[in-house]
Amino acid sequence: MKTAIIAAAAAAVTALSFSAAALSATDTSVPQTEAGVANVIRSATDLPGPLAKRGPEHVKVSFDTVEVTGALADGTTYRYWTFDGKVPGPFVRVREGDTVEIELTNDDDSVMAHNIDLHAVTGPHGGGSATMALPGETRSFTFKALQPGLYVYHCATPMVAQHIANGMYGLILVEPEGGLPAVDREFYVMQGEIYTEEAHGTKGELTESIEKLLDEQPEYYVFNGAADALMGDNALKAKTDETIRVYFGVGGPNKTSSFHVIGEIFDKVYNLASLTAAPLTDVQTITVPPGGAAVVEFKAEVPGPYVLVDHALSRADRGLKGILQVEGPDRPDLFHVAPDETKAAHN
């Protein structure tokens, strides 16, 4: 009886979509693009490095708003609205005290008007009204980065939730005057939701559902733009004992994230993305609301695959999981898997 219970439990664990073979960094479940279909996934490593220590400067940041048909899942496409053709939009890095010039160009082929509202801005609409651009137009404004932190930006053209759900969000980091402590690896991860008329898992080109958007019932949850985007070739990679920093944000537009890395504990959490308050320490899971962000740091002492999830775990089966693959020597003093004595007894 005991053996049967153990066997049943083992089978159930293996069946979990974010376990066993699904944890491999070489997993091919990441959406594969076809001819005429864009790869909208923003690599978690696609972010500029730390700024050199310097005084305030004038910094120009340009955005192109592009509407593209992209791969949402294998055999499934969706019409995305994007900043620079990827989801999330580009990671912007400036310094406290910088004067930042934002220039937004709406692509000639766009159907919709677009703009940008940056939560780092002190001024009306976060720049949204100043950058409202019809297809083919360019708009710009400047602002002074007054307060350090990690901030969400997004399109704020009505219907705002629709523009965000279709992929128009990103992060801007305002480094404090002295910069941030040096780390070995930095990653850029954002969570979002996609609302389609068709049920999750449907093949072909899907259409957005305003009804489901208003009811807050997404068919897909995504990291960096697509279902299971941060797996396979897009898995995050690190070495044992490296200090890892993740800049994490939630575009939403509606759902709060309980961000967690299975098998790890966050050594530091810059809660609510405040870079001036003392960080929390030894945290298992963080709560990040739509339009919010956080910065987490940790070391992976033991090699292997670590799974990025929202701990509302049903969402993993709708596309919300990623892999951090850590390479290095085994650490049996920290983590040791006992031999399968049951299997040995039957041989």
Segments from the language model and where they lie:
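Gram-negative bacterial Sec-dependent N-terminal signal peptides
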Residues: M1-A22
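Copper-binding active sites and cupredoxin-like electron-transfer domains
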Residues: A20-N347
